[in-house]
Amino acid sequence: MEESQSDLSLEPPLSQETFSDLWKLLPENNLLTTSLNPPVDDLLSAEDVANWLNEDPEEGLRVPAAPAPEAPAPAAPALAAPAPATSWPLSSSVPSQKTYHGNYGFRLGFLHSGTAKSVTCTYSPCLNKLFCQLAKTCPVQLWVDSTPPPGTRVRAMAIYKKSQHMTEVVRRCPHHERCSDSDGLAPPQHLIRVEGNLRAEYLDDRNTFRHSVVVPYEPPEVGSDCTTIHYNYMCNSSCMGGMNRRPILTIITLEDSSGNLLGRNSFEVRVCACPGRDRRTEEENFRKKGEPCPELPPGSSKRALPTTTTDSSPQTKKKPLDGEYFILKIRGRERFEMFRELNEALELKDAQAEKEPGGSRAHSSYLKAKKGQSTSRHKKPMFKREGPDSD
């Protein structure tokens, strides 16, 4: 301990008296003085000191106002904040399907075709529905009262008919999308195609994501009253992953070169394997419900010729009675009685048809009486056997 204290006593402690000795040890060409003097002189100039002393003390305590914000310079693309990722929801806007003839009297028409099994495309005026096969030609006629302006286009778009499916986009099923049936113009996911027109343009809407096909409007040829466009439907209505048995509508619109609407019309479509059979079945079901055919406004009826099928009208017209008599040979008494009663009933019905409404009651009572006589005539008599214990 004594040796350590003696060593410390040899060196004087650092204090203000030792600062002068340390200052003398610095080299003569000191670089610190040349680098620090100019800034010190600038910060403590005589004018600044005088202004600072003459300044109002209250003003010195005030907080300086914030400088006015300058106009922000255009940020570089790399420094811009990334926009939030936009999702791809279902389309929010649903195209209108209401008929609109416009100033040019725009209407649709279809060729006449029956309900035979061999037909590939048939139109039902009562249902306003087109039945067609997959990828088969469907002629649609465009009728106008006056010629539209140059640059007019015709757009075809498919939407779902029911309200719960209207917001979804109609597209082909994955199986048919992979089929090698492309014509080089139509995208594989588009349902409707135009046949035989190289000027067809297939569009995908940016806002609604719906598919449509647009062709330039061509006036009718010489000797023709309408313009015909041949459409193809490239997926069945029953395909899983596509329409999936959901009914669809095809909306045909007439637009000018700027996209303004000039006319609109629509019809239902069913793509199936047997159009004639399906049309006949749906028309029968429609008539069984007792619903009348929807009356379209004047000028909007589809130009389809009436069908000549036997079931086209629920009530057949009565033919006038023929006065000629016929002789029918019938084998067997029972069968003869049945035909005789039927003939008498028909004769009575014809006789009472032009009389008062009470004739129907007399007709029914007459039939009951005749039926009772005929049945009692052929019934075997039933006898009660009397035994020894009977009364």
Curated annotation (Swiss-Prot):
Cellular compartment(s): Cytoplasm; Nucleus; Nucleus, PML body; Endoplasmic reticulum
Stretches for region Interaction with DNA: 270-277
Phylogenetic placement of the source organism: Eukaryota, Metazoa, Chordata, Craniata, Vertebrata
Annotated stretches, region: Interaction with WWOX: 63-107
N6-methyllysine modifications at: 368, 370, 380
Site description Interaction with DNA, residues in chain: 117
DNA-binding region positions on the chain: 99-289
Organism: Oryctolagus cuniculus (Rabbit)
GO (cellular component) term, any one: nucleolus
Subunit annotation: Forms homodimers and homotetramers. Binds DNA as a homotetramer. Interacts with AXIN1. Probably part of a complex consisting of TP53, HIPK2 and AXIN1. Interacts with histone acetyltransferases EP300 and methyltransferases HRMT1L2 and CARM1, and recruits them to promoters. Interacts (via C-terminus) with TAF1; when TAF1 is part of the TFIID complex. Interacts with ING4; this interaction may be indirect. Found in a complex with CABLES1 and TP73. Interacts with HIPK1, HIPK2, and TP53INP1. Interacts with WWOX. Interacts with USP7 and SYVN1. Interacts with HSP90AB1.
Region (Interaction with HIPK2): 317-358
UniProt short sequence motif Nuclear export signal, positions renumbered to this chain: 337-348
Compositionally skewed regions (Polar residues) per UniProt: 306-315
The protein, known as: Cellular tumor antigen p53
Associated disorder: p53 is found in increased amounts in a wide variety of transformed cells. p53 is frequently mutated or inactivated in many types of cancer.
PANTHER family according to UniProt: CELLULAR TUMOR ANTIGEN P53
Ranges where the record places region Interaction with E4F1: 253-291
Segments for region (Interaction with USP7): 357-361
Renumbered ranges of motif Bipartite nuclear localization signal: 302-319
N6-lactoyllysine found at: 117, 136
Positions of the UniProt region annotated as Disordered: 60-92, 280-319, 349-391
Alphabetical keyword list: Acetylation, Activator, Apoptosis, Biological rhythms, Cell cycle, Cytoplasm, Cytoskeleton, DNA-binding, Endoplasmic reticulum, Isopeptide bond, Metal-binding, Methylation, Mitochondrion, Necrosis, Nucleus, Phosphoprotein, Repressor, Transcription, Transcription regulation, Tumor suppressor, Ubl conjugation, Zinc
